Amino acid sequence: MAEVGLSQNSYASANHDKKSEQQIRRRVAEFHPNVWEYEFLQSLSSPYGAPSYCERINILIEEIKMDIFDGLVGDGEKNMNPSAYDLLERFFVVDILQSLGIERHFKKEIKAVLDYTYKYWNDEKGISLASGNLIVDLNTNALGFKVLRLNEYYVSPDVFQNFQDEMGQFIDLENFKEDESKLRSLLSLYRASEICFPEENILKQAKMFASTCLRQAIEENRELVNKSQLIIEVEYIMKYPWTCRVPRWEVWNYIKIFRGDTDASMCMKGVYEMPSDKRTKILELAILDFNILQDQHHNELKILSKWWNETKVKELNFFRQRHVEFYFLYACGLYEKELSATRLCFAKVGALITLLDDIFDTYGTIDELVPFATALIKWDMSIMNHLPEYMKTCFQFAYKTYMEIATEAEKIHGPCVQKWMHDTWKTIILAQLQDAEWIANNYLPSLTEYLESSVPSTTVPVLSLFSMLLIDTIFPDDIIEKITKFQSCVAWGCRLVDDSKDFQDEKEHGESASWIECYMKENPGTTRKQALDHANMLIESNFEELIKHRIFYEYCIPSTCKRLYFDMYRSVAFIFKDIDGFSKSSKAIRDDIKKILVEPIYF
């Protein structure tokens, strides 16, 4: 890497003055412009900010506590006549509330319910349908495993060995496509298998078995006009793996499924059926909660678009202007009203880092980039004197954005944030400069070289740390050391997801270094398909590590920080699911953004 010295004025001047701006041949990736017009975002309006809707939510919360939880919270001493499925009922209620995104209103009640059910969980025998009988079925155990594990209770997947026969099947498959109870059990098994830690082979076997059966059921019902809600739910779960089922997207889809569930398939027809009046209250709360949060997002999008409209960099046409897409990525995971500052921070830093990424990867020349990197690291405006105007504009934008965030972060967490931010900032600038030098020299690095530079250049460390510092919660003094392992796992996963989707586009833009290309270089004779298959295997194993970090991380860090990292990865997996939906904001991605951020759900 070219040395980033104390001063690059003469270096920049000597090289840049040799050619006028018109003579410099710049690479341009021809990204499409920002698709979210200022006027459109400023026009967003919603009635759900009115106090009456918040009052209605509070009423519904109290009614649900009385109507549903009063019968579920407590043990046998308070409930002398438990139903024939009281444990399954508890798991079902918690699962529905979490799928609909309203569980935060019932934290105390949910903990009491799960503490009760956990007393009956046995890692060898599993759990029965009810506290008063010994009937053990696959659906209850699969749903219970998923709910308990996601809520940080230790449960072993060994219970599923009780349901696996010598042929590897977990259920009698006779007429399973027409038998809703069997199909529901298969769906619960699949959803449980998605919450897999490394080396849990029984869950991998369960996933393979359940996914094969569920895909057969989908194919069998493909031509039906009036599909059951259970089949619609199966189609959704199989189309969007848990890897990319970000919370707000999950909520939107489950509201649709729950609302259309007139045949009570979600309520496990024939086993447990929730009374319609209780279902109606839960659905009303979920829709109101979604719309009220969306009203908050409308207000934030107005702030964000106003901020962007007042910048000078918006006039530059060589980079991806994706501030709304960044906001969407973050809001899908951390959506609560009190996290407004961190959402806006993520979108602003994302817009800044994308600008710098496109300068270093595509638009800038190496003669410009070396002094530019020094200026960014040292915040030295004097270095910019002999650099082109577009870089001066970008430097001023970077400096202002960085300092605004640093000022706000210091108010919350003290002066220690200055070093944290600068160390992370320096790392990404140097990593991007390294990438630029490889491009300039047409150099394809070794896999080791690539990983040392490309993981920091994913932008994960900067985006996550800067946003985290605007979360108003108490951090341990050694928070940076504690998040390192989690952060590295997310960065590595995002790098693989990114490279596996857009390596061909980047190669056409002159960016030959991607994990795919480096792996093929290091393994002569490997085809691109083989390299992609290997990348997908690494993505899957890395996600298993992420799941374990999310649920049982070895260090004590605030739960909001764990959510930030975990859902940041899932948001990237979501937007890169089929294509690089970030660089190419397709109609499908725009429609998804509208569903979550723009269009209310009507009753």
UniProtKB/Swiss-Prot annotation:
Mostly expressed in leaves and, to a lower extent, in stems and xylem. Its EC number is 4.2.3.-. The keyword Metal-binding applies. A motif (DDXXD motif) lies at residues 357-361. It catalyses: (2E,6E)-farnesyl diphosphate = beta-cadinene + diphosphate. Residues 1-13 have a biased composition (Polar residues). Keywords: Lyase, Magnesium, Metal-binding. Gene3D superfamilies: Farnesyl Diphosphate Synthase (1.10.600.10), Terpene synthase, N-terminal domain (1.50.10.130). InterPro entries: Isoprenoid_synthase_dom_sf (IPR008949), Terpene_cyclase-like_1_C (IPR034741), Terpene_cyclase_plant_C1 (IPR044814), Terpene_synth_N (IPR001906), Terpene_synth_N_sf (IPR036965), Terpene_synthase-like (IPR050148), Terpene_synthase_metal-bd (IPR005630), Terpenoid_cyclase/PrenylTrfase (IPR008930). GO terms for molecular function: magnesium ion binding; terpene synthase activity. Binds 3 Mg(2+) or Mn(2+) ions per subunit. Mg(2+) 3 binds at D498, E506. Sesquiterpene synthase involved in the biosynthesis of volatile compounds. Mediates the conversion of (2E,6E)-farnesyl diphosphate (FPP) into beta-cadinene. Not active with geranyl diphosphate (GPP) and geranylgeranyl diphosphate (GGPP) as substrates. The Asp-Asp-Xaa-Xaa-Asp/Glu (DDXXD/E) motif is important for the catalytic activity, presumably through binding to Mg(2+). This is Sesquiterpene synthase Cad. The lineage of its organism: Eukaryota, Viridiplantae, Streptophyta, Embryophyta, Tracheophyta. The gene is CAD.
